[in-house]
């Protein structure tokens, strides 16, 4: 028993140590805040004095005749209170910041200008007064805009300190600190719903970043219009906006605001200048987004207007490439010059690597001592250093090192504690979590053995012991979002965040052996040769199979256009294998998510010892029951909650289609694609889960992976990038070889700001993997500069738009890196080796699905449509014969056509004579699949014929094409692929229209109501129309004292007797109800939502999915004793609630009156534990709630 529970106990010990570390860091930050308050007070005093002197000087200058006596300075005008902070910002002595920031070579006037440019917390009644001659004028509108656009953050002040910011950033943090957000998220193990509130302009910018390169293979569409017109492109401000952001935030050409791995988890990285630039150059947020076919038609019209397809596209590619290279060179020059002048904030933090087995030894020692939950000693003393600028970085490194080591230890401890392990605990009874509340005094640890509690769960007493009424004797399936680990002196138990994780929902017969629990356990086992299952993917994907890699390597060897047909066949085979693999990985369910990611604490409950052999029908029933519960959970990264209301339970074909739709959405707009895949349950809603998905799954454009990871506007994207680089090992590798490995997975190109963000994350990881290499340099930031220079060298050396005589030579490369290592030069042999290796082999990304499309496009002559797009995927290639008249016989050889079917396009080609042309195919026509209809025909002339009808753009006419095949097998395969592709593109367009309607109606501001009704998943199958039938949710702006809106229990009754007693389901709610406020006392007359469709009956066993650890709360024995009555009351409350209601709507049980039961209040928020690379200090209210009186109970 102790061996099975060793890993959870060890994880609890690590979490306990982490809590102590975070508390010490909080005390350090609290002390720093006190110093900031003192400096702020002194600043106010100096401001008042300075203002008084300034007013006095003004009065002396405007003095009337000399005979008059000027007014004494002791009686100033009322104006000193008007602009005191502004004058203080202009006249602040630099020595006041001597302990906070290092000395800067900039003149005092520049400091004054920086401080003055920051927004002031001035009330609305302030009036602008004349400024002194040396002050820079600031418009009042700019101040108001900056004050309005800056979002509140829990790390605004601490982030400015931890980054060694310039006086501008310091003044921004000191003068205008805002109330912090009290909702602290566990980014590593259990993130809750995203609480960042961002301006509409920044939302639009983040959405448009991923879509600006969707047409033309990474080239902005509107650049075509700028070729001949000579006007700036509509996308040019997007590339220039980051430069404006840097110049606004750091007038002295300071680099990125990141300081090592501890970035401030603040959504305010978008500065007012960036928001203003984007708002002035981008359309309104309510503007309708065109479909792909309309966008392609728009590009076609632009090309026709500006010189034709070839001329305009060649010019656009030249302009785009030159502009991006110019931006990269400009950024590199700025960073290099800043580093030479010692004005660059420290980006890379050099940290010592802790021994990997230290934590495990400490944990084992603590376990041998009887689980004495005393705080483990810290690596370093977190006491306040004498000088902030000299010692805070060391504390940052120590804290980050401890957090990362603990995170890895928690990973190792939780990875082996899976559903399979917990199911093995039970030999003849259920795993009852609530029995840990009644342990025996002589046994330490967890007492969950079912044998000791079998008398209590006997016939007639199993339901009464849990507080369940007799009417609910069926199996009660529950799914948890939040789980709390309660720690007493010698006893540990697991419960939900509201009351209790109930697993004692057993039937009357515990000795009855059935096959469903065994099937459920077998479904959760993560084996390599698992069959395709029916559970949609909450997967953590395995690496691609060897067959897929072999096919891909074979396709890579086919480089000549003459073998384009072989390339197509291999591409189609690879796509088929990838689809099957995606379906297999999708069927692994929540076990793979919990076991592989180590992000979710999984436990299971079974009623009896399962039989070894089980039928497939019972296995499918159990899988569907588990699937209905798991997919009904709310999701973390649902920016558009309306799209996450209806989890999809479908057949294998529809599940594959939805997965491909998610891949297409990612390749069009990465943020929307990730949102869709998370909402459908294909990937976990955690940064590490998304990172594994991006690294291991096929079908993703590497260009769009770089676009997603390089987006620094969203905190989730930055966390995913940190997790991605943490998955890569650069140990004992040269810098250019490590960068080659990084570039193989992520295409480092695009906007200069995104490239800089990717290189910065790579450099940080390289320094962590090679500390001995970094020690050879004077400054760890030299790694970042050198990596940036390598990217520039690779772009310059292999760009077709740069003439050979203008390419970068070795001496130019050495000259660019002169003096970047704190004034010293990088060793010449190192630079020469890097140059020679880049010259021999280009840095390029691995092949993806776009590679096959590009090879086909290069083998076609006269191609008028751009095929190489990130979202376009080759489905199949068939040899058909075009029929001009179905009623006449014709020679088939004269009309042979090669039909290439893509996921959104049908391209018709004919073979070229090999003697006349080096190309393989000649372009005939291309038709879109959206709106296409087809039917098969057979007559005396053509036995296997098909008619395709596609609508012509701009008219009601249709283009009709007739084809025939030689055999029925080839035609049948082509028809199946065509039918599925048409359904895929049609569903994708419906999803786009649905999102646009929701955006136009303003439903983005609403969140999903917990008690919203869920339609029939088998009938709706996740289509956009199913989302309209879901209940509208309550507003997302909840009280900051609540932890989240997701910590509710979702119950699903699976009992045939209960289903008969319930009768017909209630009528469904209206399609678009108004948003309902939370109702503390629901009316019994309110219309009940329809229950979930009941699957086939299951045994009285219970399967519990404890998805994530959110809180660690220390409870003593008295607190635990006071909680037991409340837990029993909460158990009866959940048992009487409806199967699909997560709110407070009561359910009338069979023969029982309606009762209004109040739920217990939510627990206090968790300790602030974020991703290992970040730290988010708690607010003042959080400190009072959690730490004012020591340990708190759940109630």
Curated annotation (Swiss-Prot):
PANTHER family on file: GUANYL-NUCLEOTIDE EXCHANGE FACTOR, IQ MOTIF AND SEC7 DOMAIN-CONTAINING PROTEIN 3
Record lineage: Eukaryota, Metazoa, Chordata, Craniata, Vertebrata
Biased composition (Pro residues): 63-79, 1066-1100, 1160-1170
Biased composition (Polar residues): 123-134
Bias (Gly residues) ranges: 459-469
Compartments, record wording: Cytoplasm; Postsynaptic density
GO terms of molecular function: guanyl-nucleotide exchange factor activity
Protein name: IQ motif and SEC7 domain-containing protein 3
Main subcellular location: cytoplasm
InterPro entries: IQSEC_PH, PH-like_dom_sf, Sec7_C_sf, Sec7_dom, Sec7_dom_sf
Gene expressing this chain: Iqsec3
């Amino acid at each position: 028993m102790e061996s099975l529970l060793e890993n959870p106990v060890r994880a609890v010990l690590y979490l306990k140590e982490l809590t102590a570390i975070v508390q010490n860091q909080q005390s350090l930050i609290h002390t720093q805040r006190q110093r900031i308050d003192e400096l702020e007070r002194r600043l106010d005093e100096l401001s008042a004095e300075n203002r008084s002197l300034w007013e006095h000087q003004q009065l002396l200058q405007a003095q009337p005749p000399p005979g008059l006596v000027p007014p004494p300075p002791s009686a100033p005008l009322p104006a000193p209170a008007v602009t005191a902070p502004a004058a203080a910002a202009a006249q602040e002595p630099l020595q006041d910041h001597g302990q906070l920031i290092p000395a800067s070579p900039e003149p005092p006037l520049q400091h004054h200008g920086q401080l003055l440019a920051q927004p002031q917390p001035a009330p609305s009644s302030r009036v602008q007064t004349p400024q002194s001659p040396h002050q820079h004028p600031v418009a009042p509108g700019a101040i108001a805009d900056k004050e309005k656009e800056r979002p509140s953050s829990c790390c605004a002040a601490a982030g400015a300190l931890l980054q060694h910011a310039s006086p501008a950033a310091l003044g921004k943090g000191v003068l205008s600190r805002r109330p912090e957000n009290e909702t602290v998220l566990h980014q590593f193990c259990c993130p809750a719903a995203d609480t960042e509130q961002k301006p509409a302009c920044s939302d639009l910018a983040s959405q448009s970043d991923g879509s600006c390169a969707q047409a033309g293979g990474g080239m902005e569409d509107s650049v075509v219009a700028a070729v001949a017109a000579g006007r700036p492109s509509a996308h040019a401000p997007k590339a220039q906006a980051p430069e404006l952001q840097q110049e606004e935030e750091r007038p002295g050409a300071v680099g990125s605001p990141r300081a090592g791995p501890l970035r401030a988890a603040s959504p305010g990285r978008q500065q007012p200048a960036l928001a203003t630039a984007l708002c002035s150059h981008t359309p309104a947020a309510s503007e309708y987004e065109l479909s792909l076919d309309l966008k392609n038609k728009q590009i076609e019209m632009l090309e026709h207007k500006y010189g034709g397809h070839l001329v305009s596209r060649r010019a656009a590619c030249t302009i785009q490439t030159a502009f991006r290279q110019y931006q990269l060179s400009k950024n590199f020059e700025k960073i290099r010059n800043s580093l030479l002048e010692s004005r660059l904030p420290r980006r890379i933090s050099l940290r010592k690597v802790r021994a990997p087995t230290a934590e495990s030894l400490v944990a084992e020692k603590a376990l041998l001592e009887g689980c004495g939950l005393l705080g483990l000693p810290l690596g370093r003393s977190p006491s306040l250093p004498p000088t902030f600028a000299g010692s805070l970085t060391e504390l940052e490194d120590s804290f980050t090192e401890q957090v990362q080591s603990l995170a890895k230890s928690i990973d190792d401890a939780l990875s082996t504690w899976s559903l399979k392990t917990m199911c093995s605990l039970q030999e003849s009874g259920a795993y009852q979590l609530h029995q840990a509340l009644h342990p025996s005094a002589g046994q330490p640890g967890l007492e969950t053995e079912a044998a000791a509690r079998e008398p209590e769960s006997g016939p007639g007493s199993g339901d009464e012991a849990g507080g369940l009424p007799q009417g609910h004797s069926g199996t009660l399936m529950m799914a948890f979002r939040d789980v709390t680990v309660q720690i007493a002196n010698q006893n540990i138990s697991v419960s939900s965040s509201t009351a209790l994780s109930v697993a004692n929902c057993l039937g009357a017969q515990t000795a009855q052996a059935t096959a469903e629990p065994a099937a459920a356990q077998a479904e959760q086992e993560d084996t390599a040769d698992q069959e395709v299952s029916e559970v949609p993917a909450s997967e953590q994907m395995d690496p691609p199979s060897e067959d897929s890699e072999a096919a891909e390597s074979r396709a890579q060897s086919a480089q000549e256009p003459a073998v384009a047909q072989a390339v197509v066949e291999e591409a189609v085979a690879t796509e088929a294998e990838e689809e099957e693999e995606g379906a297999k990985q999708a069927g692994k369910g929540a076990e793979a998510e919990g076991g592989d990611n180590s992000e979710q604490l999984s436990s299971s409950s079974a009623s009896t010892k399962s039989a070894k052999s089980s039928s497939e029908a019972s296995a499918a029933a159990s899988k569907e029951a588990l699937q209905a519960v798991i997919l009904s959970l709310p999701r973390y990264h649902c920016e558009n909650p309306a799209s996450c209301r209806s989890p999809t339970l479908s057949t294998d074909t529809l599940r594959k289609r939805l997965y491909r739709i998610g891949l297409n959405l990612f390749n069009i707009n990465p943020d929307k694609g990730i949102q869709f895949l998370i909402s459908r349950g294909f990937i976990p809603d955690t940064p590490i889960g998304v990172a594994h998905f991006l690294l291991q799954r096929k079908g993703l454009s590497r260009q769009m992976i770089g676009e997603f990871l390089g987006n620094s506007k969203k905190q989730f994207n930055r966390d995913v990038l940190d997790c991605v680089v943490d998955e890569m090992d650069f140990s004992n590798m040269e810098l250019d070889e490590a960068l080659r490995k990084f570039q193989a997975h992520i295409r480092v190109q695009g906007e200069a700001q995104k490239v800089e963000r990717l290189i910065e994350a790579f450099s940080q990881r390289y320094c962590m993997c090679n500390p001995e290499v970094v020690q050879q340099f004077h400054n760890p930031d030299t790694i970042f500069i050198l990596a940036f220079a390598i990217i520039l060298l690779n772009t310059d050396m292999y760009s077709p738009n740069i003439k050979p005589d203008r390419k970068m030579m070795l001496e130019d490369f050495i000259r660019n890196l002169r003096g970047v290592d704190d004034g010293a030069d990088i060793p010449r042999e190192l630079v020469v080796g890097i140059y020679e290796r880049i010259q021999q082999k280009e840095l390029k990304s691995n092949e993806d699905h776009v590679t096959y499309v590009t090879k086909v496009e290069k083998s076609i002559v006269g191609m008028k449509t751009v095929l190489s797009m990130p979202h376009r995927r080759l489905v199949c290639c068939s040899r058909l014969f075009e029929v001009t008249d179905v009623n006449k016989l014709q020679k088939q050889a004269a009309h042979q056509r090669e039909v290439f079917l893509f996921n959104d396009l049908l391209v018709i080609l004919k073979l070229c004579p090999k003697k006349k042309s080096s190309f393989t195919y000649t372009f005939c026509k291309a038709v879109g699949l959206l709106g296409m209809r087809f039917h098969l025909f057979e007559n005396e002339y053509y036995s296997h014929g098909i008619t395709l009808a596609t609508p012509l753009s701009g008219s009601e006419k249709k283009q009709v094409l007739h084809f025939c095949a030689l055999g029925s097998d080839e035609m049948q395969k082509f028809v199946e692929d065509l039918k599925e592709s048409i359904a895929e593109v049609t569903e994708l367009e419906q999803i786009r229209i649905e999102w646009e309607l929701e955006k136009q109606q303003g439903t983005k501001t609403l969140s999903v109501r917990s008690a919203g009704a869920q339609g029939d998943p088998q009938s709706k199958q996740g289509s956009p129309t199913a989302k309209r039938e879901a209940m509208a949710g309550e507003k997302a702006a909840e009280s900051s004292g609540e932890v989240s809106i997701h910590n509710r229990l979702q119950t699903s009754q699976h009992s045939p007797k209960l289903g008969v007693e319930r009768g017909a389901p209630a009528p469904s709610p209206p399609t678009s109800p108004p948003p309902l406020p939370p109702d503390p006392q629901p009316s019994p007359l309110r219309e009940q939502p329809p229950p979930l469709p009941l699957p086939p009956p299951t045994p009285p066993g219970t399967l519990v999915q404890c998805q994530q650890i959110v809180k660690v709360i220390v409870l003593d024995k008295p607190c635990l004793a006071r909680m037991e009555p409340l837990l029993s009351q909460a158990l009866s409350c959940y048992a009487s609630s409806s199967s699909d209601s997560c709110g407070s709507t009561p359910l009338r049980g069979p023969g029982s009156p309606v009762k209004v039961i109040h739920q217990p209040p939510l627990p206090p928020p968790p300790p602030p534990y974020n991703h290992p690379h970040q730290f988010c200090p708690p607010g003042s209210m959080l400190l009072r709630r959690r730490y004012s009186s020591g340990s708190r109970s759940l109630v």
